[in-house]
Amino acid sequence: MQLHGGFTFDDAAAWMPYLHALGVTHLFCSPILQASPGSTHGYDVVDHSRISEECGGEEAFQRLSQAAHEQGIGVVVDVVPNHMAVPTPIWHNHALWDVLRRGPESAYAEWFDLDMTDSQAILMPVLGNRIGRELEHISFTTDVINGEEQPVVAYYDQVFPVRPGTEDLPLDELLERQWYRLAYWRIGSEELNYRRFFDVDTLAAIRVEDPAIFEATHRTLIKLHAEGLIDGFRIDHIDGLANPRQYLADLQRATGGCWVVAEKILEYDEVLPADFECAGTTGYDSLLRVAGLFHVPGSVPRLTDLWERMSGSGEGFASTVLNAKRTVVKESLFTELNRLVNIAMAICDGDIRLRDHTRRQLNHAIRELLYQFSRYRAYVEPGRATPESEREIIVEAATKAREYLTIDELDALDLVVALALGETGEADMGGAVTLPAPSKILNQLPGRAHNPSDLRAEFMVRFAQTCGPVMAKSKEDT
């Protein structure tokens, strides 16, 4: 059930007798945590400690759960571990507000997947034009934020915090001294320095691979499960996580073995890794096969002809998807590509054996490898041997990518493949690099890794996280 302010927990509870009469065994609820004001879907969470007030709050959810259980209906809740909302105004997301206000001194400084290389300010691409043309619309004022009067920077309906100690500066200097940077919305696709859900700037990724962040963001849902109000969880966009396998293991330990399914799009011959501690996927793979029953095989030529005439393209589907991937990576996901290139360049700069790969060569090699992935991602982890099945996915993509590269770019591709697999690179393509434990690597603020092992681990994780959005925004959307 899609829950929101127009269809609350109590509204849903009234339907339980009817659903029971239909033979329904379980109720699947959209995310129930506090979302952005006016949210119609709940995937834009702003507060993990509260149940949606617009849907009625925790007491109303208790009534819904009770009504469902009285009819013998279990309750499954959608969990959004990958991201939080960047709402308008931002103070609705207290964690993000505090990071923008206090920077590295914030208690939430490590929550968000930030690229703080070279001490960049966090980009906030909200301005309608270049900042020089918008200064007259930006003002310093005060506002009551969560019951506390605070100095703020205001821009129309947007409100931003002010770094303590900068309140008395002239506006232009004050803006320069903040932990964030107000910018023209059009530059977000090129310069954004926080990971996000696909290409959506208003959904900022969080780092549930950190045990403390996992606990803080899941505490409320785990409590409701322990109280018997929730019977199972559906995990949204599991491929966005740094370590999906570890996340599922953490959730099982925290809940004592709860029933869990993961939103995972499996390609036709793909199977879920055997060590994923869940009951299976949400069923997209089953739906693919069931939908096939409603298609007459002999009609494929007619449907293909219709598609070609409507699209104006004589290309087959595979070529169309490949072209879509090229567009997506060069445009919508440029900032993600740029981050990978920056990490690869830093690795090369720090290891004399790997130098003399140019930025252009690495850029092209990374792009082509992303284009040729046949699945949403390979499940690789720093410090853990890569299963042969996952290695084959990357090697297969690399084999296809080689057809599009020059000789110099082929050398760069070999390095990129080695990094994606967690190997040492050109100096030793066959052996695995000795990496710190995943908890040590992933508990550091991304972008602040300095030693070679940490940079390699970061590339390994970031590359895997980028593959999914490329597939989703090309093949899935196409």
Regions found by a protein language model. Give the residues of each.
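Acidic/aromatic-lined carbohydrate-recognition and catalytic surfaces
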Residues: 1-191, 195, 227, 237-303
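Short aromatic/hydrophobic contact patches that present stacked aromatics
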Residues: 2, 205, 232
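A generic short-segment signal for beta-strand/edge and adjacent turn/coil regions
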Residues: 44, 201-203, 230-231
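Flexible, glycine-rich loop/tail regions that form catalytic "lids" or insertion modules at the edges
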Residues: 167-225, 241-249, 258-478
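A conserved hydrophobic secondary-structure block that centers on an alpha-helix together
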Residues: 223-233
